[in-house]
Swiss-Prot record:
The keyword Coiled coil does not apply. Pfam families: ThiC_Rad_SAM (PF01964). The gene is thiC. Substrate binds at residues 65, 94, 123, 162, 184-186, 225-228, 264, 291. It comes from Methanococcus maripaludis (strain C6 / ATCC BAA-1332). Belongs to the ThiC family. Zn(2+) binds at residues 268, 332. Transmembrane segments: none annotated. [4Fe-4S] cluster binds at residues 408, 411, 415. Pathway: Cofactor biosynthesis; thiamine diphosphate biosynthesis. This is Phosphomethylpyrimidine synthase. GO terms for molecular function: 4 iron, 4 sulfur cluster binding; carbon-carbon lyase activity; zinc ion binding. Its EC number is 4.1.99.17.
Amino acid sequence: MTQMTDAKSGITTEEMKFVAKEEGMDVETLKNLIAKGYVVIPKNVNRNTKPVGIGDNLRTKVNVNLGTSPDFIDIACELKKVEISNKYGADAIMDLSTGGNLPEIRKEIIKNTNLPIGTVPIYEVGADAKAKYGRVIDMDEDLIFNVIERQAKEGVDFMTLHCGITKQTVSVLNNDPRKMGVVSRGGAFLTAYIMYHDKENPLYKEFDYLLELLKEHDVTLSLGDGMRPGCLQDNTDRAQIQELITLGELVDKCREKGVQVMVEGPGHVPYNNIEANMKIQKTVCKNAPFYVLGPIVTDLAPGYDHITAAIGGTLAAVSGANFLCYVTPAEHVRLMKEDDVKEGLIASKIAAQAADVAKGHELAWKLEKKMADARMKHDWKKQFEIALDSDKPRKMREEIPSKDEKACSVCGDYCALLMVEELGKR
C-alpha cells in the first residue's frame, strides 16, 4: 500500500492526519488531493520519516542538496550540513554523494535526520559501473535496478530518476543542438548510454517494473528533468519540451499503479518565461507536484546564485511550483560548504514565504502579522524568534547597539515608531 492507494480507498493514514494539521487543512480535502495525485507525502515504509506534504494548496516546500564528490569526501562535513538543514527549517534533504563509500554516507545521513531523504540512484550506478567496468556507460539494467531496490530497502523516501530521456528525446536533442547540451549529471549518464549502445533507457523501457519496486516501499518517484536548460539561451527548447511530454505520460502510469509521483523542472529560465514554463508543466503533467531548481534568472552571478535562484523561485512558486530545490552561493563554482548550505536554504525559504504570501496562504500571512505586531511593540526577542534566521539579525543588533533598547542603531533617538508612539501618549 502507498499513501496514494490508501487515499483512493478512502483510508486516512497517520501521515495524512499529521500533514493536514501542519497545513491547517481538512484531512478529507488533503486525502482527495493525494488520491488525484496533486499532493505527495514522501515517506518510505521502512523509515520513521517526518511526514511532509508537497503539492497544490499546501505551503511551498524547500529541499537541501548535499553530498560528497570525488574531490572532497568528508562525512563529518556532510553531517554538519544535515544539522544545518534540520536547524534552519529544510523540508527535505537530497544526498547527491558521488565520492567515497556511498551506502555508508547515505546510512549516516538517514540516521541523523527525520526529514524526507531523496537520492539520485543513477549516481551510485555510475560509480559502481566505473569501479567494476572502468566506464559509467558500461552500466547495465541489473546494476540499475539493484541499486534502486537497495536504496528503497534502506529507507530512501523519494528518488530522482531520469525516465524521460529516451531515444526519441536524444534524437530531438541531436536535431536541434543547444548551446550547452546536457547539464544534468544523471541525464548525461543516460544520454551517453543511449548514444553509445544505441539502446533504450532501461528506466523507460522497464518502467512498469520500476513502479513495482517503488510501490513496494512507497518510494515517491521524482521524475528527473535530464534535458533541463543549462543556460538561458537553451530554455524551453524542443529537447526540454519533448522530455516533459514523456514525463506527462509517465505521470499517468504512476497514478494508475498508485505510485506517488512528482515532476522536476528547469534550472535556467529568463524571468519572463518562468510563468509559461510552470503552466506548461502543470498542464502536461496534470497538476503533479512540481519540483524546480531555482530557476536561475541570469547566468552572470556565480557566487551569488542563491539570489538568482530565489528571484526565480518566488515567481515559479507563485505560478505553480510546489517544491523549491535550494541553490547555494557555490553553485557553478565548487562543492558547497556548511555556510553555503545555510545561505542557500534561507534564500529559498524567503522565496517560498514570499510566494505563499502572494498566493494568500493563511499560515504565511499569520507569520507576517506576528512579525508586524512584534515590530510595533519593539519586541526584539519575538522578532528574532519569528525570523527565518534568528541568529544573524540577533548578532547584527549586538554589533552596533542603540542607546535606546527599544530602537535600533539606524535611527536611535529618531525612531519613527517611537516618535509617533510618544506623541500618542500625550
